[in-house]
């Protein structure tokens, strides 16, 4: 299971899926921080994704590189402590290029509830599923 989190530490760009009116919505997000089994993200409060998450916090993410893909799902929460917000802003330089200060964004966490780890390299392919 930890190899799935390690994979996302190395491959931070993920497809980030939300649901609105029973329809899927995808966009590319970057995993900003991982602590334990919690993933952290940041976005603008003006973006559609923020509104979607406040209306329905269920999300699924998918990261892929080569023959390996990792899918995780759970519910988003917006109660990220200020210390973690500042850490995210300080350690992800893309944010300071886009936003004037750490508090110009909203931060959210995903407490992962399910993981699928796929590796198509071995024969037969490896699929590991974890419910947390």
Over which residues does each language-model region extend?
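Short, surface-exposed charged micro-motifs
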Residues: 30-31, 107
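Charged, amphipathic alpha-helical segments
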Residues: 1, 43-46, 93
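A short, Trp-centered hydrophobic/proline-enriched beta-strand micro-motif
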Residues: 6-20, 59-63
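Conserved beta-strand in the GNAT
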Residues: 29-30, 71
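Charged, gly/pro-rich active-site loop segments
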Residues: 71-132
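General beta-strand recognition
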Residues: 15, 38-40, 71, 116
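A short mixed-secondary-structure module that forms the rim of ligand-binding clefts
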Residues: 32-67
């Amino acid at each position: 299971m930890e190899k799935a989190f390690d994979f996302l530490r190395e491959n931070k760009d993920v497809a980030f899926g939300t649901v609105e009116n029973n329809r899927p919505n995808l966009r590319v997000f970057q995993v900003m921080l991982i602590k334990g089994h919690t993933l952290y993200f940041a976005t603008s409060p003006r973006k559609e994704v923020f509104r979607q998450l406040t209306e329905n916090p269920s999300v699924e993410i998918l990261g892929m590189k080569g023959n390996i893909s990792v899918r995780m799902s759970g519910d988003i929460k917006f109660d990220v402590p200020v210390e973690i917000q500042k850490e995210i802003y300080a350690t992800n330089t893309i944010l300071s290029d886009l936003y004037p200060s750490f508090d110009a964004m909203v931060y959210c966490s995903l407490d992962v509830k399910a993981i699928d780890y796929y590796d198509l390299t071995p024969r037969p392919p490896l699929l590991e599923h974890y419910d947390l």
